[in-house]
Every structure is written in C-alpha cells, then in structure tokens.
Amino acid sequence: MSQPIYKRILLKLSGEALQGDEGFGIDPSILDRMALEIKELVAMGVEVGVVLGGGNLFRGAKLAKAGMNRVVGDHMGMLATVMNGLAMRDALHRADVNAKLMSAFQLNGICDTYNWSEAIKMLREKRVVIFSAGTGSPFFTTDSAACLRGIEIEADVVLKATKVDGVYNCDPAKNADAVLYHQLNYADVIEHELQVMDLAAFTLARDHHMPIRVFNMGKPGALRRVILGEVEGTLICDQKLS
C-alpha cells in the first residue's frame, strides 16, 4: 500500500463546501462524507488540523458593504466558523474519530481556547484538531487563519479544499479552454494574478515557505490521492512552474 507523503497537514475547508447544493447552512451528508475522509487520513497515520470558513452561515465583509461596522461583521463571521466547527467535531465523533475544537477567543463551555502547545500535543496523539474563530482578529480571512495555524503547528502543507479541480489560468466556469496548472511557484501566482487565496494569506505562506495545494473536495477520493502524492489539484511551492 502507498504511504502518505505528508505527516501533518492543515486542511482548509470553506463554509460553502459544507452547504453542498443547499445554498445555505450545512448539508449533513456532505459533513459526514468529509468526516469519513478525514478518518481515513487518521487511519493512515496522518496528523490532521482543520480550519473551517463560515461563508455558508454568514459573511461579515458582505454586510459591511451594506453599512454594518466591519469589526462587528467579522466577529459574527468568526462565530459562524465556530458553529461549523461544532458540526464538524460532532460528525467526527460520530465517525469514531477523536477530535478537539479550539477557538481563537474564549467560549467557555463550548470549546477550548486555542493553545499552541496543547494543539501540538493533541496532534501527536493523532487527535484531529479543529481551529475555529479565524485568527481572532477582524480584517483577516479564514485563509489567513489556515496559513497561520499551518505555520504554527509546523504542518507539511496547507490543503485548500475548493469546488474546482485546482488553479487555472482563467475562470473555468466562464472559459471552457481554461488550463489547469499542476504546479506553480509563489512568484508565478503573483505575476499572473491567479486566484489562490487573498494576498495577506498567500504572502504569509510564501514568506514561511509553506506549500499550498488546491484541490476539489467534491471529487470522491481526491483528499486521499493528495495525501498519497498522486497527481491531484495544484501545488504551489518554491519550485518553478511546470
């Protein structure tokens, strides 16, 4: 049997991925499938950290444009990621996976407050650690939180799960001739203005040489193939374009 090429990963799941075709909220079947795919990684010996977005429940930036104070909106968005984290923890527990939910700010009685050394300890014990509430500060996206937590826990890679197969030279939804890149370096992404994640998050990953792999979580088995080093999605790292 093939062996994982990564020992420890940070998996970034968007809130939209959890809603499936529902358009809002959480699709239980999607949640359970993701939990089973994560369970498979744990069984392979991979240490898994997870960061969840909250866009399926709330988008602070969108309401800020409509007049809401941006700080208030972002705080509400952070709470949405905690709600998604609670749902993911429950799904993992139902799948017999030991999981711990941590929040960037105190939510006594609901989940633990983020503690770096405790998170490392639990990962080494093969417990899935779910990081919620983003970075704990407004104006930072959950992509920034994913890169930050990935760097802090010394993950081998940040895996960004999306609804597309990877990074294209243009929008595949608008152009049938869009080309999928299999590997890019950080400079390529900036030079060609490719949409991987927001610039603050991407720059953080680049400055700390944190590889990012973008893949389609909707494809059955895609996460497993990524972990085993098979050709899946787009890898962004220090190496040149290929």
Curated annotation (Swiss-Prot):
It catalyses: UMP + ATP = UDP + ADP. Residues 20-25 are annotated as: Involved in allosteric activation by GTP. Homohexamer. Its EC number is 2.7.4.22. One of its GO terms (molecular function) is UMP kinase activity. GO terms for cellular component: cytosol. This is Uridylate kinase. Belongs to the UMP kinase family. Pathway: Pyrimidine metabolism; CTP biosynthesis via de novo pathway; UDP from UMP (UMPK route): step 1/1. Catalyzes the reversible phosphorylation of UMP to UDP. It is found in: Cytoplasm. Pfam families: AA_kinase. It comes from the Bacteria. ATP binds at K12, L13, S14, G15, G55, R59, T162, Y168, D171. It is an enzyme of class 2 (transferase). Allosterically activated by GTP. Inhibited by UTP. It comes from Pasteurella multocida (strain Pm70). One of its GO terms (biological process) is UDP biosynthetic process.
